[in-house]
């Protein structure tokens, strides 16, 4: 007897009643994907030759805006590697590349109509906050004071 598990039409696994499930072969899917099956590093240009220099004024501004303490060497190394990665992404040639909105671009999504079932409960929601300002929640300050 052959059972067919088909919760989604694009992922089907056939098993016999007394055997284990076979592995799903993505190459046989009815909707092939544009996402590469293996990691691709060659598309990133090599911009690691230039050392990232961050002055103390910029570090202080980032600490103030992000409420993250960047005093340790590990935090600075993480910040520099993040900037280098963003620089790599900024230099990728995306000319003639159509935008990808979803990895399941051939599958139709069933959308429902937007109908408001509950509404006008702003006062009830804001009662949960300790501090509010002009109908907004006020969060507690982080680990760095905002006044400088």
Curated annotation (Swiss-Prot):
Pfam families registered for this protein in UniProt: GatC
Enzyme class: ligase
Gene Ontology CC annotations of this record: glutamyl-tRNA(Gln) amidotransferase complex; mitochondrion
Protein location: Mitochondrion
InterPro entries in UniProt: Asp/Glu-ADT_sf_sub_c (IPR036113), GatC (IPR003837)
This enzyme's EC code(s): 6.3.5.-
Catalytic activity reported: L-glutamyl-tRNA(Gln) + L-glutamine + ATP + H2O = L-glutaminyl-tRNA(Gln) + L-glutamate + ADP + phosphate + H(+)
Domain of life: Eukaryota
UniProt keyword terms in alphabetical order: ATP-binding, Ligase, Mitochondrion, Nucleotide-binding, Protein biosynthesis
Any one GO BP annotation for this protein: glutaminyl-tRNAGln biosynthesis via transamidation
An example molecular function term from Gene Ontology annotations: ATP binding
Summary of the function given for this chain in its UniProt record: Allows the formation of correctly charged Gln-tRNA(Gln) through the transamidation of misacylated Glu-tRNA(Gln) in the mitochondria. The reaction takes place in the presence of glutamine and ATP through an activated gamma-phospho-Glu-tRNA(Gln).
Complexes and interactors: Subunit of the heterotrimeric GatCAB amidotransferase (AdT) complex, composed of A, B and C subunits.
Entry similarity comment: Belongs to the GatC family.
Remarks, miscellaneous: This protein may be expected to contain an N-terminal transit peptide but none has been predicted.
Name of the protein: Glutamyl-tRNA(Gln) amidotransferase subunit C, mitochondrial
Organism whose genome encodes this protein: Drosophila melanogaster (Fruit fly)
Gene transcribed to yield this protein: GatC
